[in-house]
């Protein structure tokens, strides 16, 4: 089983590297533990609608356009069998999105450990956007404390690149064009921050 997984991963990685080269979109790697909502977010960004999804086995890749912002987003599976391969993908992207299930604080510790396992092997700092998903499941008066807890648990002050923690709710997001959709605006604003940080990077590093 281990050899089969290794062969499959090598094939996926080879394809990944080939698809990255020559792309005009800014390439973003999206990782996080299973169940955090990565694939749901990716489909929302692509279609503007919320879809129920199944766990990602391997990776998904979608080109996403948000106004004038263009991204190539790679959604890498968060199951244990795929987490050990994150390091092969992470240095190919110019930015990182790390998804966290903020309604599951018992996994904050493990989630933070896995994030730092990746950050410690980056070949250069890059923008890190931590999306605290499922904020709708947290009482409103507790939400700021949850975000603070994630930043502290992840020890983001140690990271020498730009970082931001943004609470979102993908399942509660409505149409991206709705002026009353606070959840949708939070998601778009998070990507605006990421895009702004990417624009500060030399173009060769941001592709």
Curated annotation (Swiss-Prot):
One example of a Gene Ontology biological process annotation: vesicle-mediated transport
UniProt keyword Ion transport, yes or no: no
Xref: InterPro entries: P-loop_NTPase (IPR027417), Small_GTP-bd (IPR005225), Small_GTPase_ARF (IPR024156), Small_GTPase_ARF/SAR (IPR006689)
Location in the cell: Golgi apparatus
Keyword Nucleotide-binding applies: yes
Binding site for GTP: 32-39, 75-79, 133-136
Keywords: ER-Golgi transport, Golgi apparatus, GTP-binding, Lipoprotein, Myristate, Nucleotide-binding, Protein transport, Transport
Family annotation (PROSITE patterns): ARF
Database matches in SMART domains: ARF, SAR
Lipid addition sites, N-myristoyl glycine: 2
GO cellular component annotations of the record: Golgi apparatus
Cross-referenced SUPFAM superfamilies: P-loop containing nucleoside triphosphate hydrolases
Chief place of localization: Golgi
Recorded GO MF terms: GTP binding; GTPase activity
PANTHER family assigned to the protein according to its UniProt record, in alphabetical order: ADP RIBOSYLATION FACTOR-RELATED
Function of the protein: GTP-binding protein involved in protein trafficking; may modulate vesicle budding and uncoating within the Golgi apparatus.
Family: Belongs to the small GTPase superfamily. Arf family.
Name the record gives this protein: ADP-ribosylation factor
